[in-house]
């Protein structure tokens, strides 16, 4: 799996924006990847040094549309902490 396939999109919320001040960046990632693969992908794409990676899994939620019922997609979110002295990702 290539680095561009691992990171789907950055997560831009109020909480993740506040965490950027502490050099913590949040991404939606592929559900099949592990912390090491996320670390290598961020270092390759953005040319920064990663200190740590925390991953959260979100289960699919049950949703109804009239009489039909289904599930939302499951998600996996990674919070990447950069080492001191690294460049900002989004500047």
UniProtKB/Swiss-Prot annotation:
- Tell me the protein's name: Large ribosomal subunit protein uL23
GO annotation, cellular component aspect: cytosolic large ribosomal subunit
Q: What's the superkingdom here?
A: Bacteria
Q: Does the keyword Heme apply?
A: no
Q: What does this gene product do? A: One of the early assembly proteins it binds 23S rRNA. One of the proteins that surrounds the polypeptide exit tunnel on the outside of the ribosome. Forms the main docking site for trigger factor binding to the ribosome.
Stored PANTHER family: 60S RIBOSOMAL PROTEIN L23A (PTHR11620)
* SUPFAM superfamilies assigned to the protein according to its UniProt record, in alphabetical order: Ribosomal proteins S24e, L23 and L15e (SSF54189)
Keyword entries, A-Z: Ribonucleoprotein, Ribosomal protein, RNA-binding, rRNA-binding
What InterPro entries does UniProt report for this protein, alphabetically? Nucleotide-bd_a/b_plait_sf, Ribosomal_uL23-like, Ribosomal_uL23/eL15/eS24_sf
Q: Spell out the NCBIfam families in the cross-references.
A: PRK05738.2-4 (NF004363)
Highest lineage ranks of the organism?
A: Bacteria, Bacillati, Bacillota, Bacilli, Bacillales
Q: Which organism is it from?
A: Staphylococcus aureus (strain NCTC 8325 / PS 47)
Annotated GO molecular function terms are:
rRNA binding; structural constituent of ribosome
